[in-house]
Amino acid sequence: MKKILFLAALLLAALDAVAQPADSLAQGERRSNQNVLLNASSDSMPRVISLGIPQWGTAILEDGLPAAMYNDFFPAFWTWRSGLGTETMELTRLDESALQLGDIGFYPMSTSKVGAAKTEAAVSYTVNHFGRNQIDINFASPLGGGWGMNLNVYQDLNRGSNHLDLTYLQEHIRFYKAGISKRFSDGGRFFATWQYARRLSLGDPYGPFIFVGDGTVEPYGDFRLGYDQYLPATASFEYVDIVDGQRKSRRFVEDGGLGMHILTAGFERTLAGGAKFSLGTRVRLAHCDLTEAMLGSIENAGLLSGYGYADGTPYVGKVQTRYMLYYQDDCNEWLSTATLAGRRGKSSWTLGANAWLNWSDNHVMTTNFAYEARKDPQALRYNGRLFYVPNTGAQYFKGSQGRYAVFGQNQWSFSPRLMLRAGLRAEYSHIGGDAAYALEGLEANGRYEGWSLVSPGVTLTPVSVDNLNGAATLVALYRINAAWGLELDAVATRQHSELWQYEEETPPSDLPKDNLLVRGGVNFKNGWLDFQSMLSWYRQNNNYYVGLWTHELTKPAGGYPAGYNESIFISSRYSMEVLSWTTDALVNAGDFHFHGLLTLRSPRYSDYRFQPRFSDGFSETFDFSGKYITGTPAVELELEPSYSPGKWRFWASARYYSRQYVNITNSLYFSPRWETFAGADFALSDKVGFSLNIVNFLNQKGASAGIQAASLADDPTPFRNYLTAGTYLRPRTVEFSTTLRF
């Protein structure tokens, strides 16, 4: 009852004169899509718009609802894409994401095409020179009486640039979507869509290279990053099922993938007093059968190391180890959001509520495998096994999480010069289910080689966790004159651990993750220039992270020999602080347009301490407070010109990222890099269009690696001219697209 009263009190606080931004003051809040679909690392997911604090993946709002409840565990891009079936797409404001999602970020926000005033069809076909084929087909038509329908089919058959013997298609995505809509005479609207999605993703964007030590890399032998495969042609894998403890086999291609059904419905109507009401709901039923092969270390194998070929011949040479996670998950969601918005004089108000539920049955099995560290490698056995030391990192959780929130936003237009907007979100979260935690008295739940739920003494642990989350936002715009203005934003959120974080050997901390972002600056706008310069401070407390840390064993332990670089997962909490200065400008001069962005920042860890314990008994407390955040550049620069003469459009996008630290000790780093794109579009008519695009036209490698052996190293000397493996940018890729409209 106290929680309900708390939520009600916050909602009542938001009822006083809620408002929308006045048009005359909107110059400080421009939206765009920031070329969010131009991702140099992946051709199937949006890029993350960085605020200086790392995050994996991005939230996505589709038709007023999250495409997925979580960004990490079941990322939103698995069910979403922007194409012919998309009506509009832009980015959320920071206060929008905080109030609607409880998170801070610039996230894609799209609406789907459902119905049309007249019958229309469109087909888009894209091919690249590596053999990727995409087809997007959309058909929409009125049905009479205000009813309409829409059909969309999307197929992506992607061979990847480093063709794998394991599979012909590294990624095969199939979306089938059908929808109906009804428009009422009073302007109201109803729509419903059903989508079936099937996704198989076996891409492996990894390769070996020489880390020189000065931030640069050199090729390893004849291996070509982005072009050569770094996986053996092993069609299946072995694992120990954590449910029954049996050793089983699974095929990567035939038995893998993600399948889901998604039903979405929405209703919008203007009420008698002029207020606008909207209600949206989405149900997703999904089953995942996925593998993730994380890079381990590259080792020197001798005659007695235990590595050998299938015929028993010992192997001597470089060995690449991989740590594989196999997910068998049912991940289902029911998400509903309702909003009510109205106006009163020069003010307007918005109120909303979320009821989001995820129920999942998650089994994560782990194992290891190894192969020759070279291109087109052969698989190696370790002590006679192709897949060895299973389930030392096994995870299990069966249960649900409900998130129930109310939010409101107020805006006051005090004068043509001054606007103030404030918002609140209050959220109650409940997580319940069963896990297998290695707590005091439950030591048998501790993971070891071959562990399962039927191992001796293993006991399930009931989980019941209640938390209060929330957000508060404040935006102030002051117009100095017709061109100049001032802007101040403040956004605060509180979050707690999510359902998927309860799968591990130990429960996550119950401490909240608090985010506070404050920024302020000036903006300028005239007929050809839109300019904004902002200084921001962003702090995130109690950040939850599961890190992979490496230590060279001093004696045989855990099923590994002495000298083996053992990698273990350790969960920890820490804080991060980022002080940034960002200048953003849009230039519009006739057929020429230019977007430029420069960010200078100082990203650092704080309150970062943890104590790993390895199989040989080694344990030490590490403190990395004050270190630069790994993988986060201090300087980012974006240059995006375009020129549109007649039926042509020529464009380019170049992003510069300064030095990025490899390890948390900041002893190793990678040199600056450019991510580049360019293209030309030609509209033959309003029915036929062609596009030629080039990804990474500078063909930079952009190699990056965690160098696990150096994860806790202070001395960079042992890692000069060091053989390692990591990721890279997509190699230079030429794409050609044709779009036909009927």
Pin down the residues of each PLM region:
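Outer-membrane beta-barrel proteins
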Residues: 126-134, 156-185, 201, 236-266, ...
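Gram-negative outer-membrane beta-barrel transporters
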Residues: 416, 525-664, 686-687, 737-741
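Surface-exposed loop/turn segments flanking beta-strands in extracellular/periplasmic regions
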Residues: 212-223, 298-314, 363-393, 439-456, ...
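Face-selective signature of the C-terminal outer-membrane beta-barrel domain
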Residues: 258-289, 314-443, 467, 471-493, ...
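Acidic/polar loop-and-plug regions of large Gram-negative outer-membrane beta-barrel proteins
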Residues: 189-262, 292-323, 376-391, 399, ...
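C-terminal beta-signal and adjacent terminal beta-strands/loops
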Residues: 4, 8, 20-24, 658-661, ...
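Acidic, small-polar-rich N-terminal luminal/periplasmic segments of exported/outer-membrane proteins
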Residues: 20-118
